[in-house]
């Protein structure tokens, strides 16, 4: 089974997270996507909703969408959410499956700063979401890694055994949506219906999340 993994603060989860994940799922013919809320993001000091509330919002989204599942292993952890530790745990949970860790190009270009970043390739494939026509600049520190590990969708279709260590780039539709923008709109009394799944908006309104 091919399993995609998308982590994030999801404060709140919105179409800017969901639509690219759906496009990756379709492009790589993934069997399912694990949506994984962070508990203690290494690069962020605070969130605007509780871990329990963010878990519930993601759980409701997964119930509404086919092929999406909540993964709460980082949310249950009392230590920073280092990706290498998470992938080690997921590799034990899914020993016979092929893992695809999904990130944006903005994260990939800084991958060398991540904790034990080279070990990520020993545990999973990396999927880099990029806007159509975007390319990593020549001479960028991650250019060598991308060139050495880059795999095509055609190669994926011909592989029968689970593999890791490859990098797949997937063109995704631009999403001009951010959690910060959504929180600001809600704080001003605006309802960002086009940015949120109905179940998420309903939960936010019932819980009075992000309202001033």
Swiss-Prot record:
Keywords: ATP-binding, NAD, Nucleotide-binding, Nucleotidyltransferase, Pyridine nucleotide biosynthesis, Transferase. One of its GO terms (molecular function) is nicotinate-nucleotide adenylyltransferase activity. Pathway: Cofactor biosynthesis; NAD(+) biosynthesis; deamido-NAD(+) from nicotinate D-ribonucleotide: step 1/1. It catalyses: nicotinate beta-D-ribonucleotide + ATP + H(+) = deamido-NAD(+) + diphosphate. Catalyzes the reversible adenylation of nicotinate mononucleotide (NaMN) to nicotinic acid adenine dinucleotide (NaAD). HAMAP family: NaMN_adenylyltr. This is Probable nicotinate-nucleotide adenylyltransferase. It comes from Shewanella sp. (strain ANA-3).
